[in-house]
């Protein structure tokens, strides 16, 4: 849905990304974006000499408001872990014919620039990402930097404020407006806390062929799910992976830390595996885990930041393994799974297999039947179901 975004007398149009998604009813901005933008303008915090850092801007709602086609543009740096969010910001700036000459995008693992004057911070869903970003911010800014965070009021708890207080300094909140709230932090001169990320832990691997069993060492950046142990869904999926032939082309779609693709390669070192995710931290974690555990097969691996399987050649892959996410930012939606399934059908060779795991209540078998014309139940328990579909 293209949403008219009228704030501070600026009439802009924002689209949620990807623009082709099935569920187009979700808008690309929220009341926290409005509140934050209005506060910045009311307080005259930004001018042409200001260096502004924007964190976790879902689809560019904040960026487009500071990339106006005038000579008074501030320098705007957007920092995001999400490839989709970054692409959404670029798309919306272009669609509104805005000046991006003072606009730069960084990923979540890039070093932050020095001399930032104002930080506009959308609070992420992940507490671990929040902690990691605050630690990196504290390392990079001086005490005079203005820091304002925003989120829905119901998501800002006393525990959230304690995290800001611990890592940045004195923390205060605004009144709620349209169910959104702002958080103001004054940087103190206390020592920066040491980052606990990436976390490192081990899992046992029992080979399904004649290779010896071994321990696998897993490294997880802050924004990667299951940071300290193998989650129960991944464990169940690993127990029900198919046998992979030598020289097979495999995609670990939505790979996270890459443990599924890593398991495939531990069982079949002659497979070719592409790890795909939209999170910079996920792709970095997956690559590190191959380098740590199976460095000899790194040449058989690709690591790709992508929106599902966009631009992957059709009819080119033997097997796709996927645990589809059902959240995009704070929204619960099934359009990501639907896109992944459609893309998988296009990318698979004839006779190729899509194997997925999902929560029982998500009823993915209906979508698989609709797309592939077939679906096989591989295994199920009280919570999860593993299913397979073959491209005919």
Curated annotation (Swiss-Prot):
EC number: 2.1.1.174
Entry's Gene Ontology cellular component terms: cytoplasm
Reaction it catalyzes: guanosine(1835) in 23S rRNA + S-adenosyl-L-methionine = N(2)-methylguanosine(1835) in 23S rRNA + S-adenosyl-L-homocysteine + H(+)
Name this polypeptide is given: Ribosomal RNA large subunit methyltransferase G
Gene3D superfamilies reported for this sequence: Vaccinia Virus protein VP39
Subcellular location: Cytoplasm
Keywords for this protein: Cytoplasm, Methyltransferase, rRNA processing, S-adenosyl-L-methionine, Transferase
Gene that specifies this protein: rlmG
GO terms of molecular function: 23S rRNA (guanine(1835)-N(2))-methyltransferase activity; nucleic acid binding
rRNA processing found in the keyword field: yes
Major enzyme class: transferase
Protein's job: Specifically methylates the guanine in position 1835 (m2G1835) of 23S rRNA.
InterPro entries: DNA_methylase_N6_adenine_CS, rRNA_m2G-MeTrfase_RlmG, RsmC/RlmG, SAM-dependent_MTases_sf, Small_mtfrase_dom
Family membership noted in the UniProt record: Belongs to the methyltransferase superfamily. RlmG family.
């Amino acid at each position: 849905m293209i949403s008219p975004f009228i704030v501070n007398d600026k009439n802009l149009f924002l689209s949620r990304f990807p623009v082709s998604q099935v569920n187009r009813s979700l808008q690309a901005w929220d009341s926290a974006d409005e509140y934050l933008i209005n506060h910045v303008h009311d307080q005259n915090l930004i001018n042409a000499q200001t260096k502004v850092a924007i964190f976790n801007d879902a689809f560019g709602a904040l960026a487009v408001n500071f990339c106006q086609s005038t000579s008074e543009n501030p320098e705007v740096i957007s920092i995001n872990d999400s490839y989709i969010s970054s692409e959404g910001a670029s798309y919306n700036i272009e669609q509104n014919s805005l000046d991006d000459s003072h606009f730069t995008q960084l990923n979540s693992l890039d070093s932050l620039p020095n001399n930032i004057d104002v930080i506009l911070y959308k609070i992420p869903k992940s507490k671990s990402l929040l902690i990691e970003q605050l630690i990196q911010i504290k390392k990079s800014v001086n005490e005079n930097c203005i820091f304002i965070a925003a989120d829905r009021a119901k998501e800002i708890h006393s525990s959230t404020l304690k995290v800001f207080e611990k890592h940045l300094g004195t923390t205060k909140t605004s009144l709620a407006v349209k169910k959104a709230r702002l958080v103001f932090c004054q940087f103190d001169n206390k020592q920066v806390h040491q980052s606990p990320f990436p976390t490192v832990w081990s899992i046992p691997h029992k080979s399904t062929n004649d290779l010896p069993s071994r321990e696998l060492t897993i490294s997880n950046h802050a924004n990667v799910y299951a940071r300290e142990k193998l989650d129960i869904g991944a464990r169940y999926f690993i127990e029900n992976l198919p046998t992979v032939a030598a020289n097979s082309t495999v995609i670990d779609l939505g790979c996270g830390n890459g443990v599924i693709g890593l398991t495939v390669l531990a069982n079949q070192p002659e497979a070719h595996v592409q790890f795909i995710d939209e999170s910079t931290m996920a792709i970095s974690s997956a690559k590190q885990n191959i380098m740590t555990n199976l460095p000899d097969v790194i040449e058989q691996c690709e690591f790709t930041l992508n929106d599902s399987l966009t631009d992957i050649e059709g009819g080119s892959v033997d097997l796709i393994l996927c645990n589809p996410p059902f959240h995009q930012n704070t929204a619960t939606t099934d359009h990501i799974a639907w896109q992944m399934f459609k893309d998988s059908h296009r990318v698979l060779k004839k006779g190729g297999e899509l194997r997925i795991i999902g929560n029982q209540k998500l009823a993915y078998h209906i979508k698989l039947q609709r797309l592939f014309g077939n679906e096989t139940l591989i295994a199920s328990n009280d919570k999860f179901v593993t299913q397979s579909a073959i491209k005919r």
